[in-house]
Amino acid sequence: MSVTNILFGNSTPKAETDDQARACLKLLSGRNHMVLTAVALIAPDGREASRLVETRVQFKHLSLQEHADYLAGGEWRGKAGGYAAQGVAGGFIIDLHGSYSGVVGLPLYETLNLLHGLGWVPAGKAVP
């Protein structure tokens, strides 16, 4: 699985430093961006299935204090785009069209559909 944030045609990295996180937040503040999540699976018999999931995320305009507080909290470390939608930064999201779980990490609905298409049966369920 690969996750990439796209903002104005550019990929945003996983933030590892305060400066990287600050730059990401500055770009995201008050704007829309796309989160693209690719899922690829290979069944034991070699069959393959893949899906690209696109999610549009709209951030509110962040005040200088919100920037400073979020950076001080450290939640952004190692996060694509410098934010964690499942945490404090979820409060910065005005609108989201697509897969919330894809923004957080793994697009569950789409992944389960791929698995079912390859014949996966959940544990405890009878095989027809």
PLM features: residue spans?
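Anionic-ligand binding patches
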Residues: 1-128
